[in-house]
Amino acid sequence: MHRYRSHNCAALRKCDVGTQVRLSGWVHRVRDHGGILFVDLRDHFGITQIVVNPDSSAFQIMEKVRSEWVICVDGKVCARSDEVINTTLPTGEIEIFADEIEILSKSDELPLPVFGEPDYPEDIRLKYRFLDLRRVTMHKNIMRRTEIISSIRRHMQDSGFTEFTTPLLTASSPEGARDFLVPSRIHQGKFYALPQAPQQYKQLLMMSGFDRYFQIAPCFRDEDPRADRLPGEFYQLDIEMSFVEQEDVLATMEPIIRSVFEEFSDGKLVTQSFPRISYDEAMRKYGSDKPDLRNPIIIEDVSQHFYDSDFKVFAQILANNENAQVWAIPAKTGGNRAFCDRMNGWAQGEGQPGLGYIFWRKEGENFEGAGPIAKNIGEQRTEAIRTQLGLKEGDACFFVAGDPKKFASFAGASRTRIGEELDLIDSKCFSFAWIVDFPFFEWNEDEKKIDFAHNPFSMPQGGMNAVDSQDPLTIKAFQYDLVCNGYEIASGGIRNHSPEMMLKVFNLAGLSREIVEERFGGLYRAFHYGAPPHGGMAAGVDRIVMLLQGVKNLREISLFPMNQQALDLLMSAPSDVSATQLNDLGIRIFPKVNNA
């Protein structure tokens, strides 16, 4: 028999009754029932119940054992009686009567419990992540992550993609998020950077004559953490394809993403044909470029009902700004003053002056609007708004006014909040859409200049003719995002492959030829030697796993994440390094100056 085990802790079944076996694992919990010890023994695969009778030679040893000790058990497989079968365990029809027990490893007093999985401070969980990962839920999350990534790989390979690995030490590209810099010992005073994404390398692969590339790529960005974004490191499904147009990429990746979600959705419905929604339409209807389409609320322009009205706040906004609009956010079933006042208070908590509203009651055969806005604009305009929005008794709507470029995101947040508060969001589906036709440029109000709105390497719609003749702020890009349930899970574009156009668009964003050649010299040079039309995308692996596992925080599906302060509490990183190491790199640390 093997030194440590003949079977794992999920392997034994009723057909194994009478077999002499050896199991090893962690003591999940111990229960004393009338002097008989019942031990749940756990390993990577599952749990098996061990029974230790007081007349067994193993009993005295087992009395000393505590939770999370590692033991080896020899014993015989026995059938459980019908009344004690545990249907929640694959091994629930059997138990092992222990003959011998060997203690392989002891555990100190636990800083957090493994059994039961109560809520526990996150910093403790991260500091003792090796214990946290023993919890059944965390173990399942990590194993599901592995299964999802394996499935993605299979689908990519079946679709004709080849997996390549690109360098992790590269040049700094500071026009995006902050880089993680790596000092060079050999070339003192110079720095490598960890890649924010393999963007240039994957395009260079297309220049190198390869056709369909993918990798599960580690990416590094020195940015502030959020619940749906880990500090420091994350992983993306990175792809690139040669000789393709936008629809080719979408048509290739849509069935792959859909199949992965269907495989791991646990019965939730998955959109069968992903709709294409323009960026402008998404902002107009949903107040977001990553709309949650499970939410049935559609925002509407009701400006016409407020021109020259007696609701002077909105009327003056419309009169004083030709770009101003009034948007209505319908709230079916939200037609009571308590809910409307609660939403108004929420808006004020978000730094807004408030959230105007109307709610409708039935007076005989007629609908009556209630609230300050209805009182000011009168019955006719109030009824026209209700008719336009298709609202009934017991419904409400909320209003925002001004320049949509400034208030659209708040309108979108209001739509989300209303949908959540009124329980309008279908939690039993994954609702996908492609967002297309993004603006290529945007106005940077702080620096009074034009900036790239998204990926600077994308192809402008209309090509060089659009770049030469259009107002830059009106140019659209062949860029697209894939959104699901209010999250952006993928982003991509058709790439510019012309060196002349590359210089032109970067010049519009204030970057000279010299800067382009310095920062993107490899890609720029490659464009001069026969660059194929190409495009691709990158999908957030961590975010996909988070959605499929139904968790709200990426740390719940990541092995050894940092905390919200970008600290690795398990490995004590970042850490001080020795003076010798700094000297080798030609680095001197200056004390931080307090300017207060």
Curated annotation (Swiss-Prot):
Provide the protein's localization: Cytoplasm
Q: Catalysed reaction per UniProt?
A: tRNA(Asx) + L-aspartate + ATP = L-aspartyl-tRNA(Asx) + AMP + diphosphate
Supply the source organism for this entry: Bartonella bacilliformis (strain ATCC 35685 / KC583 / Herrer 020/F12,63)
**Record-listed E.C. numbers:** 6.1.1.23
Residues flagged as site, Important for tRNA non-discrimination: H33
Q: Which UniProt keywords apply?
A: Aminoacyl-tRNA synthetase, ATP-binding, Cytoplasm, Ligase, Nucleotide-binding, Protein biosynthesis
Q: Which PANTHER family match?
A: ASPARTATE--TRNA LIGASE, MITOCHONDRIAL, ASPARTYL/LYSYL-TRNA SYNTHETASE
Positions bound to ATP: R221, D222, E223, E488, G540, V541, D542, R543
Region annotation (Aspartate) maps to: 199-202
Single GO MF annotation: nucleic acid binding
**What InterPro entries does the record tag this protein with?**
Aa-tRNA-synt_II, aa-tRNA-synth_II, aa-tRNA-synth_II/BPL/LPL, Asp-tRNA-ligase_1, Asp-tRNA-ligase_1_N, Asp/Asn-tRNA-synth_IIb, AspRS_core, GAD-like_sf
Family of this protein: Belongs to the class-II aminoacyl-tRNA synthetase family. Type 1 subfamily.
Q: Where does L-aspartate bind?
A: E175, R221, H454, R495
The entry's function note states: Aspartyl-tRNA synthetase with relaxed tRNA specificity since it is able to aspartylate not only its cognate tRNA(Asp) but also tRNA(Asn). Reaction proceeds in two steps: L-aspartate is first activated by ATP to form Asp-AMP and then transferred to the acceptor end of tRNA(Asp/Asn).
GO CC list: cytoplasm
EC class, as a word, reads ligase
Assembly: Homodimer.
This chain's protein is named Aspartate--tRNA(Asp/Asn) ligase
Name the GO terms of the biological process aspect: aspartyl-tRNA aminoacylation
User: Quick check: keyword Cell division in the entry?
Assistant: no
